[in-house]
């Protein structure tokens, strides 16, 4: 029981800004931490639903609803994933060989492409957020934070890594693969059922979109990894 609780605390300590008890991380606890990665999304979803209720209760306008709603994930995570997104966009749009892209990922400076892609992403996000006008739609958005982390966790445990170092490698290399994958797949199934219950049509659209995106990146990453392996073998 204590190992499970510590694994939960590690997940929140690593992937959120929510204050957590401090202790020395042990391998036996870290190997289950990824099981609780989606729960960070659950926390974001819970705050999102509270914000939806607050806006309805006190007649907050759509602009404030969308802007602050967009800020909630950033505030909870501390922009952890945004930092990675920006690094990735700089590397991807450099159109350089794989080794050069890995160097760009390590560079702490931001480039023009990362800023452009982030602004584009946030504008689309705010625009979509402003169109939420029903509690069930808000519920699906909230559940989406959980779903995205389920799929992200599955990808981290399944896709070949770009490098054998860094925080992601540290967590995935120490993870109990079978237990983590089982937990993530079960949680994915559970949140999928919830989305379909909230709104069948919207739920199907979200799940299909998420599934296709996952498959696209699976094929892309697997192909890139295969080509890199073939190049090293030549």
Where are the language model's segments positioned?
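Membrane-proximal soluble regions of multi-pass membrane proteins
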Residues: 2-23
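Alpha-helical transmembrane segments and their lipid-water interface positions
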Residues: 17, 81, 90, 118, ...
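C-terminal ends of transmembrane helices
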Residues: 21-23, 154-163, 215-223
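Multi-pass membrane catalytic core of lipid/isoprenoid biosynthesis enzymes
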Residues: 31-48, 88-136, 140-141, 178-195
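Membrane-embedded alpha-helical segments that form the functional core of polytopic membrane enzymes
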Residues: 36-86, 140-142, 202-218
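Solvent-exposed interhelical
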Residues: 150-184
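Glycine/small-residue-rich hydrophobic helix-like segments
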Residues: 183-223
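Conserved small/polar residues in nucleotide/adenosyl-binding loops
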Residues: 224-231
